[in-house]
């Protein structure tokens, strides 16, 4: 018989918020009796944008901005119905994107 697994991917711009959310999820799953592996840090995406500072000319004067997307992966093996109910009722902070695969 195949084991049932829930895979949760978290994405956020702030690493502190994503780590707090991951700890809440892991703590909730362990309290309900499921096996948890993670949080596993995935590679951080870095997007760099270059913008000309001046409005009309002075192309040599530029400014660069970057946006980092932090990601974490959590696997919950053999979840119980109690685990699923606890995860559905969990309040996580805004700014965290959650993808759940069964």
UniProtKB/Swiss-Prot annotation:
Q: Which HAMAP family match?
A: Ribosomal_uS10 (MF_00508)
The protein's name: Small ribosomal subunit protein uS10
List the InterPro entries hit by this protein, alphabetically. Answer: Ribosomal_uS10, Ribosomal_uS10_CS, Ribosomal_uS10_dom, Ribosomal_uS10_dom_sf
- Gene, per the UniProt record: rpsJ
Q: Which organism is it from?
A: Staphylococcus aureus (strain JH9)
Q: Which family does it belong to?
A: Belongs to the universal ribosomal protein uS10 family.
Query: What PROSITE patterns does the entry give?
Result: RIBOSOMAL_S10
Which proteins does it associate with, and in what oligomeric form? Part of the 30S ribosomal subunit.
Q: Quote the NCBIfam families the UniProt record gives.
A: PRK00596.1, rpsJ_bact
According to its UniProt entry, the function of this protein is described as: Involved in the binding of tRNA to the ribosomes.
- Any idea which GO molecular function terms this record carries? structural constituent of ribosome; tRNA binding
Q: Name one GO cellular component term.
A: ribonucleoprotein complex
| One GO BP | translation
Which SMART domains has this protein been placed in?
Ribosomal_S10
User: Which key words tag this protein in UniProt?
Assistant: Ribonucleoprotein, Ribosomal protein
